[in-house]
Amino acid sequence: MAGAGSWLYLTAGLLVVALPQLSHSCPSRCLCFRTTVRCMHLMLESVPAVPPHTTILDLRFNRIKDIQTGAFKHLKNLNTLLLNNNQIKRIPSEAFKDLENLKYLYLYKNEIQSIDRQAFKGLASLEQLYLHFNQIETLEPESFNYLPKLERLFLHNNRITHLVPGTFSQLESMKRLRLDSNALHCDCEILWLADLLKIYSESGNAQAAATCEYPRRLQGRSVSTITPSELNCERPRITSEPQDVDVTFGNTVYFTCRAEGNPKPEIIWLRNNNELSMKDDSRLNLLNDGTLMIQNTKETDQGIYQCMAKNVAGEVKTHEVTLRYYGTPATPTFVIQPQNTEVLVGESVTLECSATGQPHPRVTWTRGDRTPLPSDPRINITPSGGLYIQNVNQDDAGEYTCFATNSVETIHSTAYIIVQAVPQFTVVPQDRNVFEGHTVDFHCEAQGNPKPVIAWTKGGNQLSVDRRHQVLSSGTLRILRVALHDQGQYECQAVNIVGSKSTAAQLIVQTRVTPVFATVPNDMTVEVGTDVQIPCSSQGDPLPIITWNKDGIQVTESGKFHISPHGYLAIRDAGLADQGRYECVARNPIGYSSVSMVLSVLVPEVSRTGDPFVATSIIEAIATVDRAINSTRTHLFDSRPRSPGDLLALFRYPRDPYTVEQARAAEIFERTLQLIQDHVQSGLMVDLNGTSYHYNDLVSPQYLNMIANLSGCATHRRINNCSNMCFHQKYRTHDGTCNNLQHPMWGASLTAFERLLKSVYENGFNLPRGISGRIYNGFPLPLPRLVSTTLIGTHTITPDEQFTHMLMQWGQFLDHDLDSTVVALSQARFSDGQDCSVVCTNDAPCFPIMVPPNDPRVRNNARCMSMVRSSPVCGSGMTSLLMNSVYPREQMNQLTSYIDASNVYGSSDHESNEIRDSASHRGLLKQGIVQRSGKPLLPFATGPPTECMRDENESPIPCFLAGDHRANEQLGLTSMHTLWFREHNRIATELLRLNPHWDGDTIYHETRKIVGAQMQHITYSHWLPKIFGDVGMKMLGEYKSYDPNVNAGILNEFATAAFRFGHTLINPILYRLDEKFEPIPQGHVPLHRAFFSPFRIVNEGGIDPLLRGLIGVAAKMRVTSQLLNTELTEKLFSMAHAVALDLAALNVQRGRDHGIPPYHDFRVFCNLSTVQTFDDLRNEIKNPDVREKLKRLYGSPLNIDLFPALMVEDLIPGSRLGPTLMCLLTTQFRNIRDGDRFWYENPGVFTAAQLTQIKQTSLARVLCDNGDNITKVQHDLFRVAEFPHGYVSCKNIAKMDLRVWQDCCEDCRTRGQFSTFSNHFRGKRSTEHSYKEDNKEPSSLLNQSVNTTCNTEQPKNLPHVNDFKEFVLDMQKTITGLRKQIKKLESRLSNTDCTDETGESHSTKEKWNKDACTKCECYNGHITCFVKSCPPVNCSRPQRIEGVCCPVCTDDKIQST
């Protein structure tokens, strides 16, 4: 016992010793061990203070009733807290704050009745919470919101009857939940718990227990098995809805909302789609019946209100209502602004927009360009102002603007709808079959949003990485120099973020096989009148196409020529005109080969079938032609024009008598042969237009010469004299002769048009295609009027975004400098003198345009539009220039073919004399009345009534007189003529000021030369680049030099079809604008009222309004479906009670009149692909509707007329031309430039300084200098500019400085006399060097004086009469001395030998060495010596050796040896 007592005592002692060490941290009577504090059964009434490092705190079995705030402060390390078996009644908010690491909390077997909302806030690590065996009746919905890691929650054996939805919704880590042994009422409000328990059960991650206590029928049922049908739950339904309210400041607003449902719905109010919080604003009250009461209303209360009724079975909303607040007027402000929104195709989208203001603003929507929304049932505006679009498509993408408008102001906000779409192919690649070495393009384009990226693969694999495979920015795959291994399938993929699409095409590569001739032609000689077949065939892969050329001009299918499928050329009725060199050309995509032969035609001396009828026929032809011409003259000039046909004939009637006589002679010649044909036909009883008749058998060559003499053809041949080189080296002739000294008639006026291809006539000579109803390639040719109405005419006009109407006007003005076809002088048929417009038959010279049945524009049952054929050239149609053979009909160009300002000066001496002011001797052109601006108009034409006086009700003012007879055709053209006539007089006046010693002729010709150069520069440097674009300018090429082998003559195809493309640029209205570029009071002029109306210039403001209209208004864009406006096709030269003409139909008919080959032949000439079907045209005419129209009209692509086909070709990018038209125009303009000896860039035409100044000129400068009062223009008159920003003052437009034309000479007394050009001026009265029209001497005398010196001088000062005797003596002495000198010169000239400076004589052609370095030669009395040039020496001391010209390096040679 003693030992035991000692042990106890020791233990007690140790305890006593240890306790003092822990007394400052361990609560009294508690047991503390390390971090565990146990205070059980101590009757504690509050939580004691414990050490901060405590991890386990056991407070069980005490009498704790309340948990004080901060009771567990600083216990951040606490892991387990045991508070069970106490007397706690309430868990206050944030009772366990700072216990962030607490995992286990025991609160069971207390007396807990309530738990505040945020009681467990801060317990982020809590995993287990035990609250069972308490007296809890309700739980706040946020009680367990802050327990993310809670896995176990025990609430069984409490008094819980209802649970608020969402009570456990935040417990994401829950694994076990116990709610059993509660008095749960299983009604509709507990369905949320049933759903939660089912989720726990299905997932298997958590266990839960909850049973129903009430109603009795469900007692003991697991809550998870309860269904809504068992509880009779009902979704809310609205029984009373709110209405819009208008309120003023301070009033009270009531919004009524009543709803029924099971359980009773909760009423929630929304404002502008946001829930209203009644607690945040004491003015807001929710009454028991759901009514929203707003007291003391303020401006901020206005907006969109909506009531929502909600219970566990669902929710429902009322319609939106508006509270409008009316206080002080206030500008609108946006409550909700639209936002950029992305949407997929096919889905719906809403752009929200609402606004407030006083009064309440009205909300409207537009597209971004302020255009109204389309009327589309898919598009609606919501009651709140939002824009709602259903089933969105790609067109809905773009900018939308919301406008909020009240009486104070309008505000707007913009947003974009971005429609995202899966890529869709717009262009898919086509299978290609090409030859190796060629380049192939696979076109592939797609659309989508975002814009898809194009990628290419071959056979599913990446393309070869080499420079031959290129993917262009457009998506096109280009393979250069195709090789055999490139063959295969190529896939195009279009990819964007929404999706991708793929398509494929095959490439087949063929080996190259160039054409090889299988049959070659040989030279042939045949008799006149026989049919000839020239063999030629070729092989190759692909099969070559055979074409034939005669003397460099391509042969086309016609009544004269036929090319068989094998390539054989058949020539019908061979004549002398057919002999020459023929070339057979075999062409395929790989290359071409050619072979040629010579055809000779013999003319036997035998009589012909028509010889007996020559005499009577020529007499009858002269009588009938003269009768018809005189009848036409009387009809046209003795009265006012009665019809559009009269008007057309009158303004195109030649003014030059020589032209009239030449045309008359040609008509008589052709009429004579026609009469002979008629006589022969009546005897043979055969159809002369048939294939069985041979024209070369008609008349013998000697009779053809007789007909030529009697008709006047031989009489009116021009004999050109180009011997006056003092003139021809410096200036042009008016008629264009002697420009090309090797070929004086090339490019001259009144000569035949040139041709690229042989003419096509039905009979091979003069009968137009389609005139006899013949079938071509299985189809008849359509009526030209039908072509116009079906294909060409348009009411719709698309403005050109780049170029002004001046682009058209310069083209017309230029055309009138290049070509004008001489038409028949008679408007009546030769056979009986009846008017062509009345009889409507194709009897010479009538060629009417027949009107289809039911044409909408025909009046008075008219059957045709009047038209006569172009006059033939003497020597064509029936005869050659030798007058002994039959040649195809050719037409006559009345103008020079050069750009020489002939539209200003005329194309003949007769015309130039009419418009020159010869009386003033100042080199001016005649001028008319002077306007208020101080600037003159053109002079009026004199003579009989003109086309400008067709309507006496408008004005009696006659036509203006200018260099071209068409100057009055329309007001814009007349304005251009006025500009350039003033430009001539302006330059001439300045040149006279600079060179007062020049005479009138010199000033005139120098000015004419400058004006022509200005027009050349404007055309090629400013105008053509707009028409041709970069592609065409490269085809045209740079100017190199004058080429005398280039014929600058105008091509028939150019004048008759190609250059008429300008008709597609014409607007239907001529605009007239004032200084502010606003319409003038008299208004604009419809085009059909602008024809032949000079009175509008005289009486209605001059030329300035018209010029501003040309530079200030866009031209008409050439669109394949919008070609010629109806002012040209329906109202051309319209007059009352008459059928107006149709320009498009005239163009088609004129092409057939001139024998222009079909479009297909020009495709071959221009190296485009041949076509067999209309789909073969798809590369040049992409519009399928246009191709279908062509098919309906022509039946075969081989029949299409040239003019309409050129007009419907798609434009080459950057140009205003299609590919064939580009080919024809570049060919013509290259010839015009390169074949002109006086081209302004040709060295020697102008000095370098003068050329520099000419290149300063511009149409803008001409407009500034010569308009009535134009002060502002754009730099480039051809480009569209916005007024006034795109315009500049005329002061800023570069000028041409004429001072470089000033003579700098010591003795200017005779310099500048027209007869003293350059250093070879002549005396004023020197006949041998006079200008042609001043020279009265016979040409024979002129020819004898060609070697006479051009320089003669007059005495400087004549002596006074008193000194006359001395003067005579001096003159006699001078004459005697001159005679001696002349005799010496004559003796020297008569001797062809030479005498050198030493006096030694040498015979002609003798050569001798004057010294070692000089060799001389005698030739025709002149000695010419040549001095040898020595190379540089490479030694320090070169040596000269006698007899050797050049020094040698002797030292070097010695050293080297």
From Swiss-Prot:
The active site is at 816 (proton acceptor). Glycans are attached at residues 630, 689, 709, 721, 1167, 1269, 1343, 1347, 1434. Homotrimer; disulfide-linked. The homotrimer form is predominant. Homooligomer; disulfide-linked. Oligomerization occurs intracellularly before C-terminal proteolytic cleavage. The VWFC domain mediates the covalent links between monomers through disulfide bridges. Ig-like C2-type domains are required to sulfilimine bond formation. The VWFC domain is not required for trimerization. The LRR domain mediates high affinity binding to laminin-1. The record marks 966 as: Transition state stabilizer. The gene is pxdn. Residues 26-53 form the LRRNT domain. It comes from Xenopus tropicalis (Western clawed frog). Belongs to the peroxidase family. XPO subfamily. GO terms for biological process: angiogenesis; basement membrane assembly; basement membrane organization; cell adhesion; hydrogen peroxide catabolic process; protein homooligomerization; protein homotrimerization; response to oxidative stress. This is Peroxidasin.
